[in-house]
Amino acid sequence: MIAQCTVDYLGRLTAHLPSARRLLLFKADGSVSVHADDRAYKPLNWMSPPCWLTEDVAGASPAWVVENKAGEQLRITVEEVEHDSCHDLGVDPGLVKDGVEAHLQTLLAEQVQLLGEGYTLVRCEYMTAIGPVDLLCRDEQGGSVAVEIKRRGEIDGVEQLTRYLALLNRNSVLAPVRGVFAAQHIKPQARTLATDRGIRCVTLDYDKMRGMDSDEYRLF
């Protein structure tokens, strides 16, 4: 939707976006994001799933109130709608991993003890409604752990793992599910975001992992 609107965030802090033309995205996973023309792919404000949208018609202009389970709210007051359309994009196949990233996943599945003593592999490419989790593991106490593997660990990867964790933790068989963000190099901003969300970061030494004993790449 493209609309003239104001946006207010109410939660751990407050933020206000004055009236302007903006792009509003309401995705099938429940997320809502507010975009302008000058920030590339980054939204001005957003609410990640799980969250719920209700309409408030009590004021002079209709407003959508998006609230997450923590009680934080994104209030979008619509003054004028310029464009409104709905599209079903279907199931996305996801990113195709490059050679190094795919190899990292294979190696870590074989050397899952690098994540911690007592870790065991449950499944590679554990499928969810929003895409496959790279590795689903059990820790030394039998708890579920979702692992996202990247060559370069950036904020997008942390956001991706956050979405997986939100979905997996709705599964009473798996919950509680913790997250591990594993990469060759993890940017400071991504590490800070992961830590803030309770996700553990693990730096992978690709060269060392390739030098370890691997059933797939053993010649004899």
Curated annotation (Swiss-Prot):
InterPro entries: Endonuclease_NucS, NucS_C, NucS_N, NucS_N_sf, tRNA_endonuc-like_dom_sf
EC number: 3.1.-.-
Keyword Cell division annotated: no
Highest taxon of source: Bacteria
Principal localisation: cytoplasm
GO CC annotation terms, alphabetical: cytoplasm
Subcellular location field: Cytoplasm
Enzyme class: hydrolase
Keyword Nuclease: yes
Molecular function GO labels: DNA binding; single-stranded DNA endodeoxyribonuclease activity
Keywords, alphabetical: Cytoplasm, DNA-binding, Endonuclease, Hydrolase, Nuclease
Matching CDD domains: NucS-like
Function: Cleaves both 3' and 5' ssDNA extremities of branched DNA structures.
Cross-referenced PANTHER family: ENDONUCLEASE NUCS
Similarity remark: Belongs to the NucS endonuclease family.
Protein name per its UniProtKB record: Endonuclease NucS
Native organism: Mycobacterium leprae (strain TN)
Phylogenetic classification of the source organism: Bacteria, Bacillati, Actinomycetota, Actinomycetes, Mycobacteriales
Gene: nucS
